[in-house]
Amino acid sequence: MISVHTRLKVIDNSGGKEIMCIRVLGTNRKYATLGDVIIGVVKNAVPNMPVKKSDVVRAVVVRIKKTINRKNFFSVRFDDNAAVIIGSDGNPKGTRIFGPVARELRDKNFSKIASLAQEVV
């Protein structure tokens, strides 16, 4: 579960390396889980890229460390907390996504992110 001040790894090629969550979007929500949109500030960035350090961006949570229990009695857990930076229209800013992402993104209408990913778990 992602709360305020949690740092997440950015797994696309938009230019950010790490973001810190400053707000979970929704009505009075404390935690974000897979497929939730957060607002974050870029803490580390690659030089000469569109996303700069200290930019305020929207991102979708695509991996969390907490165990996810699915309805088919499987449970999935990732090694890190990761996000993909998106624009105001909901499409990713990067053109590539590195590493696996969760299947729950398709259910939450982020099929563009799921189709760009190397692996959907």
From Swiss-Prot:
What UniProt keywords are attached to this protein's entry? Chloroplast, Plastid, Ribonucleoprotein, Ribosomal protein, RNA-binding, rRNA-binding
A Gene Ontology cellular-component term: cytosolic large ribosomal subunit
- List the GO biological process terms: translation
**Its domain of life?**
Eukaryota
Q: Which InterPro entries match?
A: Ribosomal_uL14, Ribosomal_uL14_bac-type, Ribosomal_uL14_sf
Q: Where in the cell is it found?
A: Plastid, Chloroplast
Tell me a Gene Ontology molecular-function term this record carries. structural constituent of ribosome
Q: Which family does it belong to?
A: Belongs to the universal ribosomal protein uL14 family.
Functional summary from the UniProt entry? Binds to 23S rRNA.
Q: How does it assemble?
A: Part of the 50S ribosomal subunit.
Identification of the protein by name: Large ribosomal subunit protein uL14c
Gene (name only) = rpl14
